[in-house]
Amino acid sequence: MHRRFTANDAEEDGTTQTSPDSTAPEGTVFHHANDGRPLATPWQVATERSIALADRPLAEGYIVDPACGSGLQVWAHALTLARPAIGIELDPARALASALNLRTVGEMSGGVGLPWCEGSAVLAGNGLEAEQALTTALGQASPCVAMLQLDPARPRNSRHHDLSEMRPALDGVLDAWRPWFAPHDLGPAMLLDLSPRLSADQRAQVEAMVEERWPSLRRTWVWTSRGRGRVDRLALWTGPLADDGALRRFVRIPPKMGERPFTVATHHPVEPLTITVHPPQRGEHVSLLDAALVESGLVAQWLADVTKDTDLRWGVVDGRRPQLHHPHPLRLRPEDRGLVQATGRVVALFQGSLSDDTVQDVVELAIEHRFSSLKLRLATPPERQPAWQGALDRQLNGRSGEREGFLAQHPNGHTLLLCVDAVSNP
């Protein structure tokens, strides 16, 4: 059985918590259950993804999210696309939070009373019981799903996990909702918001599940990043949601509200990057690039727009700090700068790794090379990073140096690179 909530009848019962979202309009407070806040999609990310769907030719019908959590993504879709939506959540407290958030989104947008808000509902119950859910929400079940949004729960604090650990299971969701899609010439519209840590093999498994049920269905993988060296979202968009012919798309969400995202897409298969480790060299340039851009496979296409260098050498392609070595500075446009964590010219080499014993030696080398600021751009023990960065800041600040820069780790693992920042010191 499912319990039905709407924006009009949801009442706080003490099982939810509230918290502001800095990416939402000022004063907006969203509801979460228990530890739901860290799992919730930021409102800015949710709305930007919904805006990207605005020109997609969906069938008539409802947006359905069978594992909606706090509901921010499905209500962003409903608001932006002006369509009613049905969110389903197994946990009753999260279902209530989602209904309260439906009301919040309606109130902050002036949507209360409009068809998309009045026609939307939250069901507390099993998202795999599709027929029963539609009957509870609408009075009867029929093929009325214009779009399926899915963001299944995954193991937390785990760098790698199997597809079978997602809840609800992806194959179960596809089978449960397969009969209920509204007819469309391009097939079912699905936004499968999966783990950002999916490997290439796991992505192939997901595609095989979709292909088995809907042969030749159009699909596009979309990587989304807000920077900070991480992939925030990885999703498969299918049917009318997929880009026409585009196999992959990368979206960089800007740090400032109101700015438009930066997008790169390709219609062609991508080649894997090859690591080439050369001895460290003074005078060469080092760039730490957006991890999601590199993981998406679209970095070569982007690099063709910002450099004419042909001698590009990848030192690191995985993790939070993909590292590229090149002879000349990148020619960055304003919109490109969000894709670069740091870029600059190597002016000094330090043989060894950063530690409590060597940080003072690094400070002295930085002073010798006229640095006024040197930011750590390498993996460090979390408990030591503040002390090491603090030592650099205290001793370089107020000196006669005029260079701003960063400290990176050469891929050989035993050389530190002191780099003059190319953006601050053009």
Task: Go through the PLM ranges and name each one.
Residues 1-426:
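SAM-dependent transferase fold signal centered on methyltransferase-like domains
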